[in-house]
Amino acid sequence: MFILGSGSPRRKELLAQIGVVPDDIRPPDINETPLKGELPRPYCARMAREKACAVDALPDDVVLCADTTVALGRRILGKPEDATEAAAFLKLLSGRRHRVITAIAVRVAERVWEKDVVSIVRMKSLSQAEIQSYIDSEDWRGKAGGYGIQGPAAALIPWISGSYTGIVGLPLAETAGLLQAAGYRGAS
C-alpha cells in the first residue's frame, strides 16, 4: 500500500502528474517547532523524517512525507498563524531572494530514504497595496512563507532557480527517484 503522509492537496496533485495515486492519505501529527538554533535545511529534513516515522503503517507499506520551508538567511518562515503574520512575511520577502527547501522522506518498515531540494526565489518589491491584495485573497493560508507560487503570488515572483515543483511542495524528479529506490513500482 502507498500512503501519502500529507494533508496537502498540492502534494496529491503533484503525485498524480507522475502517475502516483495514494492508496491512503494519513497526515501525521507532529510538533513542528524548530529546535533552538536549528538552521532551515536541517530543520526541514528533520520534519520530513519525523513525519514519515510518525505515520502508522504496516511493514511493507510505502510512506511518503515531505516538508517545505521558506528560509530568509538563517530564519525559518513557516506557515503564518494569521493575516498579520502573513503580511509581515511578505514584507520581509519583498524585493529579496530567499530559499525554498523541500525535504522528502520515504519509509518502508524501519528504513527511510531522504532527499532535500533547495530552490532560490526572488520576490519583486511589493507595495503595501499589493501585500494587502494578496492577503485579502486568502491564498497565503497553510503555505510556508505565507505564499503559494502556483496561485496569485505567481505575479509577485519574476525569477526562480531550482525546482518549480519543489517550491510548490514536492520535487517530482527527486520524489520519483526515492520511490524507485524504496521499491515502489507504481499504482497496482
Curated annotation (Swiss-Prot):
InterPro entries: ITPase-like_fam, Maf-like. One of its GO terms (cellular component) is cytoplasm. The record marks 10, 68, 150 as: Important for substrate specificity. Keywords: Cytoplasm, Hydrolase, Nucleotide metabolism. It is an enzyme of class 3 (hydrolase). It catalyses: dTTP + H2O = dTMP + diphosphate + H(+); UTP + H2O = UMP + diphosphate + H(+). Disulfide bonds: none annotated. GO terms for molecular function: dTTP diphosphatase activity; UTP diphosphatase activity. GO terms for biological process: nucleotide metabolic process. Gene3D superfamilies: 3.90.950.10. Its EC number is 3.6.1.9. Nucleoside triphosphate pyrophosphatase that hydrolyzes dTTP and UTP. May have a dual role in cell division arrest and in preventing the incorporation of modified nucleotides into cellular nucleic acids. PANTHER family: BIFUNCTIONAL DTTP/UTP PYROPHOSPHATASE/METHYLTRANSFERASE PROTEIN-RELATED (PTHR43213), BIFUNCTIONAL DTTP_UTP PYROPHOSPHATASE_METHYLTRANSFERASE PROTEIN-RELATED (PTHR43213:SF5). Belongs to the Maf family. YhdE subfamily. This is dTTP/UTP pyrophosphatase. It comes from Roseobacter denitrificans (strain ATCC 33942 / OCh 114) (Erythrobacter sp. (strain OCh 114)).
